[in-house]
Amino acid sequence: DKAESRGLGDVYKRQIKKEGRPPLRELNNFMVSQLKNTISGVHILPFNPYSSDDGFSVIDYTAVNPELGSWDDITALGNEFSVMADLVINHCSRESLWFKNYEKNKAPGRGYFINGLEFEDLSQVVRPRSTPLLTEIHAVDGVKQVWCTFGEDQVDLNYRNPDVLLEIVRIIRQYVEQGIHFFRLDAIAFLWKESGTSCVHLPQTHELIKLLRLVIENLDPSAVIITETNVPNRENLSYFGNDNEAHLIYNFSLPPLLLYSILSGDCKHLKTWMTSMPPARSGRAYLNFIASHDGIGLRPAEGLLSPRELDGLIENIRESGGEISMRRTPQGDLTPYEANISLYSAMERPIDGEVDDFQMARFICAHTIMLALEGLPAIYIHSLLGTENNREGMVHSGRARTINRYHWEADDLYAALDDDGRHHKAVFAEMKRLIQIRIAQDAFHPNATQYTLHFSDQIFAFWRESLDRKQSLFALHNVSSERQTIPLVELNLIATEAWVDLISGFAYEDLAGQIVLEPYECVWITNKG
């Protein structure tokens, strides 16, 4: 239905705060007052008690961090929006009861974690971080080397132990009872470990996802599962399974490719990638995004951008105040893993260019493209607001990802959104306007037909058609800083129908004329205005 096309807002639980009010309650207030008729779902990043990584090192899965609010606040938000919660089930905190009991060799916790000393060959393990894979602990039953994919405070769970799986099932049941509708399986690709393998995307991991889907759909047949697998494109697509794994998969190649296209003024790689993407079958879809609480993943661009092009993008990000996080390869080398930068700040200058007047135009162009693509859009709250780099917070925390995790004081935010002299007001208004245009179009259903159109490499264009074939929509986007012209005859518009650009409202009456696109201008031309 139309609600499917509205998309998700991606938000940290503390990103809007007001003294004397729990952050989750203030978030609800902002969402209802500002986005009720624009966004249909909200992804609240981990809201449990945690020890590190901004929530992704969970101490207690069954509780809401009292500093943030309560389960009542989560339920209240769920009464207005579809709520997505993270299942951070690859690992949990060293401060959790489970891990403390593991060290004591008592239940619950005995056998819940992985002792790397029991694995003969770890030479092929794929790492998303540069930290050591194993961390030594002194437990009551001897010295162990616990497996830590993401860092020493985040200890991987042992799914060879069925008690671990039963714990996760109980947690899922509680979340469903509290009104959670979307389940994001965080870092799920690393779930199963096997000696002598990469320990990523293993067949056992896919079997566990199938099992979790059966459990979740048994509890709530309308629930939706999203897999978070920040990996090269082919591996990412495998998480659809045979209609028995994820309902939604993140389109991880989109952020680096779209950013490169906008900053280079050349979309040939974006077009090549899109023509290779199979359409998602009915009942499943791509989750399109270009910014999130994490950085912009660079691994999904491997094989799509050349090393020289990737180096150019990385240099541009650094010039715009961003950072590059590294991972360690099985050979021990450090290689770029993700770009840490606010998306608005990333649009500051073109590659090999200087700061210019097109920052907002580039930013809006990128989101206009994302909103038009096959799939469901997910928009990070700092993209809705046009938040810039939080370098002060990054330096204070010592974590690169903090650069894109700014915490707005509610009064400051509302003042910024009401100030004609600040870009936040214009960004927020235009983003909401584009989303509301999208909502009304049958051709933007997540599974509506999509075909790539081939004009110059400065124009990223595609055609969408509604499931009932009544609405045709041509989405054309100038990704360059130069004016572009396209003869209307190249679109093969049906002369007996009226064609209008939904974004500007301009009616195309002379089909022998031309479309003129100013720098970073976009048009959505349709026969159903």
Regions found by a protein language model. Give the residues of each.
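Active-site and adjacent substrate-binding regions of carbohydrate-active enzymes
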Residues: D1, S5-G529
